[in-house]
Structures are given as structure tokens and as C-alpha cells.
């Protein structure tokens, strides 16, 4: 497999320049170790489509190498016994270190099935306040340092406004021990081996691979900003303890994939990613440990098909 070193100019502005202007920023990037990029155009059509598999997402052997365009997922929270009981036995490891090992194993399988230049978008909530634990940082370390993904950035998902959010403010109106309250989660974005999608669009069309964009230009401008305001989903309405809103995977799908691409969610839950895929003309593959949630997701996906 051929490799190439990333060393290209960009069109971003210099630090301290208020307007956007073209320039060669290689001097800035020269201060960091250059990532090794894979010059690999291997893309395999995915034979497993529009299916939710019941099983452990550390084993994605049913999915071939280099066949997935995008992984978008929200792993189960490491959030305590009540939540873990609702998810079912074995869904969340007992210790935080075991939890990170589980995520690493899943993301390693995601690397295998992603096509070169395929993207992964991981929605995570940071943990606790005594002390605070940055799960976003730990996931970034796993993706970048352990597995070799190329980090593309981090989106801040704003779930509420102003004085909303939880009421655990610590010492109210006092400097004794004020506590920051969560209004946001993170979406860590990374790529497999290269920043661009493997195979040029003109070649994709000739080979019968997905090549058509569907994103609206106004949406593109809004969604390439690193803050997204999206209302959270109702757990009671969906029937799952922690569903992310369908709008979140929909934006990732429109932004990072072509019409007809296959999207994977290794923690499918109530089927939000599959619903977003159906509504945007993409295929989906899901993995879910709990058969009851597989059935729930399949019902909700079918409802989405019927309503479109």
C-alpha cells in the first residue's frame, strides 16, 4: 500500500487576520509532525445493507474491509447503574478503563470496514465533576494515537440555551464550590488514512460507485461550523434511555457521504442513524447487542420508510 506525506497549502487565514484570504500555511503545519497519508483507492461495495445485526460490535466480521463510507455513532454512556440496567447486561463494562478498551476494539473494527478516506463521527458526553473526565479527549487519543485515524475536528453539540440544563450547580451563588452545568456534548470527527474520499467522483460514476452529493449549499455553510444547535430527543417518546436526535446523524450523513453510500452505526440503539440514512437516500448497517432494541429500531426504521 503506497503512502504519501501530507504537505499542502490551504486557503485559511493567518492567525490575527480578520478576513479570509488565500495563503500558503505550510510554515504553520511544518511545526507539527506530518501525518502519513495512505494512497489507497480500494473501495468495495457493501453486500450487507439496510440491516441491523444483533451482536457485539467488537466483531463486525459480517462487513467486508473497505466497504463503509461513514461510521456515525453514539456509544453507550458510562453513566451509572440505572442507565446500564436499562441497556441490558453486558452493554457497558464495569470499569472506565475496560470501557475505553471496549471503545478501542470497536473503533479498530470500524477502521477495518471503512473505505480509505471514510469518516467516523463519534458523539460523546463528558463525565462527572468530582473530578471531571473528558471522554472526548480519551476518544480522541484512541482514534488518533492508538489506531492512526486522522483527526478532522470536533463539533460542539449545543442541546439547550441559557439557564437550561441540569440543576447541579454546586454552591449556589457562592464561590465556595460552583459547578459547571452541561449544555453540550461533543462529536469527534476523523478519517481513515486520508482526508479526501478514495476514488474521484468521475471515476466513481464510471465504476458504479456512489458519487452524487445531496447537501444544500446553505446547510453546507452552516454545518461546517463547529457548533450545532439541535434539540435533544425524548427518551420516553423513543423508548430508549439515551437516543441522540435523528438530525445529528442526518447532518453527518449529508456532509460526509454521497447518495447511495453505506453508513454504519456499531451502537445502533433505537435506530436513529438508520432513520437518517433512509431519509437521505443512503444505506445503513447497524449492530446492537440487545434484541429488544434491534426490534425497536427495525420498527422505527420501517415507520420512517412508510412516512417518507
Q: Would you name each region that the model predicts?
A:
Residues 1-296:
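Core catalytic lobe of class I
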Residues 292-308:
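Cysteine-dependent PTP/DSP-like catalytic domain, specifically the C-terminal lobe
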